[in-house]
């Protein structure tokens, strides 16, 4: 549901007044007109950004608890599970850093390729890996591990959902801007 146009205009004017740096020299009229263009809607997703933010702060705690629990149960694990869990820890650490960067860049800068990369890494790699660690009882899941895995799985699940919605919204917005530019070019040719 969209806001009525007068309220939307007033909120836009208010946000420009509050968030535009007024301390520097005044820009030229052209810069001002380009910067304050009324037709530019923000399509980044606040729920996705909040999930990414809290995930970024939770991940070091998850990583430390995972390393401590892996050290405690290492001698009781089968050899192939030792290799699998260490590999999963390394892969998840690398993927998480890349994934959080792509998610932030794609969402805040409204870049579709970065957001699509974030969503694919989340859905195809992180989600199955965390579910493997959460539900495979052969890896001797400890209570602390189960707790932090559940929290991380909830973050990842929320990011899959919010990322899909944000990606769909961003693609539709980009597509409509493309068609409007194309239509504007046709109108200029006619005149």
Swiss-Prot record:
Gene Ontology BP annotations: cilium assembly; non-motile cilium assembly; smoothened signaling pathway
Entry-linked Pfam families: Transmemb_17 (PF09799)
Domain of life: Eukaryota
Membrane-spanning intervals of the chain: 50-70, 83-103, 115-135, 147-167
GO cellular component: ciliary membrane; ciliary transition zone; MKS complex
Key words, A-Z: Cell membrane, Cell projection, Cilium, Cilium biogenesis/degradation, Membrane, Transmembrane, Transmembrane helix
Record keyword Cytoplasm present: no
Main localization category: membrane
Keyword Nucleotidyltransferase: no
Matching InterPro entries: Uncharacterised_TM-17
Compartment(s) of residence: Cell projection, Cilium membrane
Membrane topology listed for this record: Multi-pass membrane protein
Quaternary context: Part of the tectonic-like complex (also named B9 complex).
Similarity remark: Belongs to the TMEM17 family.
PANTHER family in the cross-refs: GEO07735P1-RELATED-RELATED (PTHR13531), TRANSMEMBRANE PROTEIN 17 (PTHR13531:SF14)
Function: Transmembrane component of the tectonic-like complex, a complex localized at the transition zone of primary cilia and acting as a barrier that prevents diffusion of transmembrane proteins between the cilia and plasma membranes. Required for ciliogenesis and sonic hedgehog/SHH signaling.
Name the record gives this protein: Transmembrane protein 17B
Organism: Danio rerio
Lineage, highest ranks first: Eukaryota, Metazoa, Chordata, Craniata, Vertebrata
């Amino acid at each position: 549901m969209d806001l009525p146009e007068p309220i939307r205009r007033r909120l836009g004017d208010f946000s420009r007044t509050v968030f535009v740096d007024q301390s520097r020299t005044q820009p030229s009229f052209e810069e001002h007109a380009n910067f304050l263009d009324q037709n530019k809607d923000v399509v980044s997703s606040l729920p996705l950004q909040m999930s990414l933010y809290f995930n970024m702060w939770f991940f070091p705690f998850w990583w430390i608890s995972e390393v401590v629990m892996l050290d405690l149960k290492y001698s009781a694990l089968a050899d192939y599970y030792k290799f699998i869990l260490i590999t999963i820890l390394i892969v998840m650490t690398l993927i998480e850093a890349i994934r959080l960067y792509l998610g932030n860049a794609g969402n805040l800068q409204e870049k579709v390729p970065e957001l699509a990369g974030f969503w694919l890494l989340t859905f195809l790699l992180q989600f199955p890996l965390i579910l493997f660690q959460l539900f495979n009882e052969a890896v001797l899941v400890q209570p602390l591990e189960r707790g932090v895995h559940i929290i991380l799985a909830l973050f990842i699940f929320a990011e899959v959902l919010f990322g899909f919605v944000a990606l769909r919204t961003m693609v539709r917005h980009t597509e409509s801007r493309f068609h409007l530019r194309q239509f504007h070019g046709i109108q200029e040719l006619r005149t």
